[in-house]
Amino acid sequence: MEAKLDLSALNHAERLVLQTDLWFGSFSDAQQQQLLQQGRRRVLSAGQPLFSRGAPFCGIYVVLQGQLLISGLHQSGQQALLTLLTPGQWLGEIAWFDQMPRTHDVQALTDSQLLQFPKTALQQLVQQDPLWWQRFGQLLTVKLRLLFVELEDRALLPAKQRLARRLCQLSNDQQLQIPLQQEQLGQLLSLSRQTTNQLLRQLAEAGLLQTRYGTIELLNRPALVQLAQHGTLLS
C-alpha cells in the first residue's frame, strides 16, 4: 500500500520520531519541510518485503513505526541477519549515491509504516538545492561511523557486553519489547544460538529481562545500559 504523504497525517508520535533523529533534527524548519514534501507513506504488513538484493534504486526510507530486518542470502542458502531497523532509522541511501542495485534484502518484522522519498523526488530536491547532496552524504557517514564502532566492539568487547549494547540499541524507555527470536538475535551478533541462549538466561536470572517465544522483554533497562557501557552491573 502506498499513498502520497499528507503532512497533517503525521501524528505526534511520528513527528517526534523524526524530530529526535540527529540527522533530520539538525535541519532548519524550512529544510525539514522541503524534504518531507517529497515523502510518500508506505505501509508494510509483518513479513512483507520492502525491497530485495539486486533490485534497482527506488528511493530512501525512514521508519516511522514498526521494525524491519536487513538480511542477505548467501549462495550456500544460508541467511545472514545484519541489523534490525527501528523507528527513526533511515535506509537505502547507498544505492542513491552509487546508482547500483540494492545490496541486501529488507522486510518488515512487524507491521510497519515508513516514509519513502522516491528517486524522482530526490533528483528534483538536489536540483533545487545541491546542498542536499552534502546532507545525504552526512547521513551515509553516520552509518559508516556506527559500522566502525560495531567492528571495534566485535573485536574487543566480551559477548555479554555486546549483547547488552545491542539490546539497548533495539529498545528505548517506551519500547521495551524486542520482537526477535533468540536465534535471530544471535545472528545479529555473530554468536552461536547456544551462547546467545546462555547469556540471555544469565540476564534473566539477574532480573534484567525475560524471554518468550519470538519476544525479548526488558525488565530493567537502566541496569542493561550500565552493563552495555561498563561491562558489569554497578551497585
Model-inferred region functions:
Residues 1-46, 95-96:
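Cyclic nucleotide-binding regulatory module and flanking cytosolic helices
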Residues 36-37, 55-57:
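Short, small/polar residue-rich loop motifs at catalytic or cofactor-binding pockets
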Residues 47, 58-71, 87-88:
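Glycine- and acidic-residue-biased ligand/ion/polar-headgroup-sensing regions
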Residues 49-55:
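Short phosphate-coordinating micro-motif centered on Lys-Gly-acidic
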Residues 81-138, 145:
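Cyclic-nucleotide recognition modules
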Residues 147-159:
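Short, Lys/Arg-enriched, Trp-marked, Pro/Gly-tolerant hinge/linker segments that flank
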Residues 157-162, 167-235:
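Phosphate-/nucleic-acid-contacting segments
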